Amino acid sequence: MKFTKFFSFLLVVVMMFSFTTSTTLAASSSKTVTSRDTMSLTLAQQTSGDSSVATFNFSGLPSDAVVTKVVVDANSGLTYGGNGAIVSNRVHIKNDSMDNYTSAPWGSLNKTEITTGVIGQPAAGTWSIYYNGTNVSILAGSSWKKYSSPKLTVYYNYE
């Protein structure tokens, strides 16, 4: 008698787990590339402008890899000088398959996560970035700011 009750209880538990639905999320992969380029910007007092472009080669990724987000990390090679302070405003990014750049506000600690405009884009290919900055100084003369060897991490899934 005890065996049948135990077996019935066990059967009910197994049935409960077999009828519940579970959600599985696709694992996201990522690749980080360091650019050999420097994003540099020189500005006169109280002016804004765009830096030079840094490029990243992601040609080794599978052709069916699509972007879920990208992260720009410009923290490692920051140098600046001159008569003022240049504030980084926005980072602009595109890859080979995009007609135009998309942008996002510059992130804290020089790291910027971008999803808008890049989700669903092919991950493979050449990516390009630059930043927009403003010299907030009231001192006469110009200032410069450089981000050497920025890093770009592309997070992707497969179609």
Question: Across the structure, where does each feature detected by a protein language model lie?
Answer:
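Bacterial Sec-dependent N-terminal signal peptides
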Residues: 1-13
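Sec-dependent signal peptide cleavage junction
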Residues: 6-8, 17-32
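Solvent-exposed, flexible loop/coil segments flanking beta-strands in beta-rich domains
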Residues: 26-59
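A eukaryote-biased signal for long
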Residues: 49-51, 64-65, 109
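A general structural motif
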Residues: 64-67, 124-126
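A short beta-strand element within beta-rich, extracytoplasmic domains
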Residues: 65-79
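Beta-strand acidic-aromatic groove motif in beta-rich domains, primarily in extracellular
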Residues: 80-93
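Cysteine-clustered segments with highest specificity for TGF-beta superfamily mature ligands
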Residues: 93-159
